[in-house]
Every structure is written in C-alpha cells, then in structure tokens.
Amino acid sequence: LDEQKGALRWGNLMATLGWRQQVDSVRYGQANLFVTRYHMRASALSRNSYGEPNTSTYQASVSESVQSNNLLDVGLRGSLEHRWAAHRWQGGFSWTLHRYCLEATLSQSSNLSANLENPTQRSFSNQQLWTHEGVLYGEGDFRLSPTVRMSGGVRLALFLVEQKGYVGIEPRWAMMWQPFPGVHVQASYARQHQYSHLLSESYINLPTDTWVPSTARLRPMRSDQGTLSIGYEGVHGCHFSMEGYYKQMRNLLAYKDDFHVIGSFANWEEKLTVGKGQAYGVEWLARKEARRWSASLGYTLSWSDRQFAEIDNGRRFPSRYDNRHKVNLTFSQKLSQKVELTAAWTYSSGNHLTLSVENYEPANPVIPSRWQMDGYGRLDSWLPNTYEESLNAYGRRNNYQLPPYHRLDIGLTFYRPMTKGRMGIWQVGLYNAYCRMNPLFVIKDERRANCYPLVNTPGQSDVYRPVFKQVGIV
C-alpha cells in the first residue's frame, strides 16, 4: 500500500515608502524605502506498507518532510535625473540588507515492523545568512546627430557576505541609427552580476526552487549580452521589429548529479557545482495600435544550454528552459472610458527534465534506502527497507522534453477616477480560460512516461481544475 500527499504554499509581500521632489525645471529627484518578503513552504507525506499485518514479513513506514525558503529584503534607494535639450543624465544609489533562510527542513519518520516497536526519528535544519549589497550608478542618453542616438552608463556594485566582499563593474552601452524615417537599427552590450542564485531541483512550473546568495566559496554569476535589432514604425499605428541576441553566463550554480546522496542536512554548498552557459536566438514582434484597441504578436526562436565539469561528464546539455519556440498574442479593447477588456495567449515548447533510460533489478535484494520522487518532482528518501526494487540508469542531463505549454488569460479592468488626480483600478479575470491541461509532473512505468496536469486523481472528493479566478486592486 502506497499513499503520497503534498502541499505547496508561496507568496510575496512588499511595502514601499517614497518621496519625490521637482528640484527645478530640469532636475528631478526621488528616494524610496522598501521591504520585501518571499516565502515558500512545501510539505510531503508518504505512507508505505508491505506484507501481511501481524506477520514476520510486514513492514510499514510513515515519512513526513517540510521544506521552506524565505528571503527578506530591507533597503533604501534614490536617484537624481537631469535633462537639457535632447539629452538626459541620471545617477543614483541603493543599499539592501538581505536575509536568506536557505534550507529550513523538518523531517520526521516512523517505522512499524514485526521486530521493531514503532521507532521515530526527527531531524531539523535551519540555515540563515545575512548579506549587504550597495550600488552606485550613472547613465546618460545623448543625441549625437539628427539620426544617431547613444546611451551608456556604468554600475558599481559591492556585495558583502561572510566577511568577504565582491566588487562588480557593469558597463552598459547602446547606439541607435535611423537611416530612413520610421526605420531604426540598434546595437547594445551589457554586463551584469547577480548575487542571488535560483536553484532548481525539480522540473515543474511551480515555485519550488530555492533562492541562495553568493558566498565566500561561491562567486556571483556574471553575464555578458549583446543584441542587434532593426525596427519599423509604420503608418496607422503599425510597428515591426526583429532582434537577435547572444548571452554568455559564468559562475552558474546547479545541483550535482549525486547531490541527494550527500544528505538532506548537509551544508547546502556541498551539493552544488559551478559551471557556465549560453543563450541565443531571434525575436520578432508585430504591434498594431488604434484609438480604442491594440494587438501584438511576438515569436521567439531560441537556444539555451549549460556546461558543468561535474555534470554529464562535462558535456553541454540543454537547460531546463531551452524552449525552442515561443509565441505571445495579446489584445486589448476599450469598451468605455472606464472599462477595458484584455486577452493574452501564450505558447511555448515544453521544459526539459531528466528521466532514466534503463532500469535494472539489484543483485542484492537488500536495498539500504529507497530513493523516490516526492510530490514536487524532487528526489527524496525514506527509511531503510528489505524489499527488491529496480535501479534507475540515467543518460544525458535533461534528456526528456515535456509537451508544449499554452493557455489563454482573459481580464476586465475598471478605472475609477478619485480625488486629487488619483485613479482607482479594479481587475478581474480568468487564468487559463479554456482549461488547457498543461503537464505538471511525469510518472514513469515499465512501458512509458505519462504526463499529468494539475488535477486530483479520480475518486477524490475535490477536483481542482487549472482555471483560476483573479481579482486585483491597484
């Protein structure tokens, strides 16, 4: 008898206190004090039993695990903007205190058998880390001639963690040329450092990933991206553009192939390996704007891969989000001065995940521990057992691609003018309006790998369809 249950909760909270000041006709300043909090809590319960009760072969196990990830940011940022003629300059600063609750894990289990009197094991691990991030930046936008415009800037960042400091210099540059009226050609380059890493140990499209910071052992991620685009601003509100891009990434983090063997309560840094990646592609966009309606159609053809010395023998493999084709279609219609109808349809090639290509029966029927997938597509384990089970043999990393993902979102927006020039906005809508059963997880048996959407199994009292009502107030 096997029974598995899972639950997932996540959310964001944000509060901001702002100040704005018009210094004079050409200078403008602002400052903001902000607090943000992200939290995620995933729990899994597993019950397993084998053999006949009250016999020497009977075994039963109950295992429960809870994982949570929390990120708290408190910071201050300010900027000053100066405009003159056709030029603009802006400079500013920011300081942020980060608190990471890295892997708050609670695990408890019990075992029943003919030879044991219900032993219980409980474990708890909670790792916190505080970091500081300071930024100074300056940028300008200048018109060099009637047909040439250039913008550029530099961002200087300081990140302090575990008595170690990282300094990042991030130049940015872009130039636009208008050879003909309505036609522009643009090239750009940007370098970025990222001090927070998003680690993924599952393939499902839910926020089960973990935010971790750069540390004294793990350097910040660095990326360099270049783009080249051409656009056309046509008559009657028609716009067309095409852009090619290439992005190179260094100091990427990923879980090792055998990270689950290290144990749930080991230092999280020991489970990671450092590598590199690249992403490139071409994007097309067509947009039409009329007096009471607007529509846009976008298509992206892209590639993305990763390379780690300790994963897949150092060979390149497709990233989780190596979605070859993406289509976005949007439409909005003003029904009146106070009501607007919106619709958005999205299509994407499926994400990648790793599935075993072969299964073997073990030579020794005594298995030290059973490794399995929990309710969120992550590797998990439970108490030792003595039954025979097949072993998985994996090929390349991310060797399986899920079916395509698509959905339609529909919404209504109500505008209500208020006093002192303010505007109240109410929003209602449907997420996944035509109830597309997009794959959520995969269960593999001896013959095939089956994809399952976000729907409870038959026979349960409540059936959750992947259609959600949305209500918002701005």
What residues fall within each predicted segment?
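Face-selective signature of the C-terminal outer-membrane beta-barrel domain
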Residues: 9-164, 238-241, 289, 296
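Residues that define the transmembrane beta-barrel architecture of outer-membrane proteins
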Residues: 9-13, 70-74, 130-134, 165-169, ...
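Residue-level signature of outer-membrane beta-barrel architecture
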Residues: 21, 72, 78-84, 141-144, ...
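Outer-membrane beta-barrel channels and translocator barrels
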Residues: 24-26, 84-87, 145-149, 178-182, ...
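Transmembrane beta-barrel strands of outer-membrane/channel proteins
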Residues: 31-37, 91-97, 152-158, 187-191, ...
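Surface-exposed extracellular loop regions of Gram-negative outer-membrane beta-barrel proteins
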Residues: 177, 181-226, 246-269, 344-359, ...
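Gram-negative outer-membrane beta-barrel transporters
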Residues: 246-248, 266-357
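C-terminal beta-signal and adjacent terminal beta-strands/loops
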Residues: 338, 347-388, 402-474
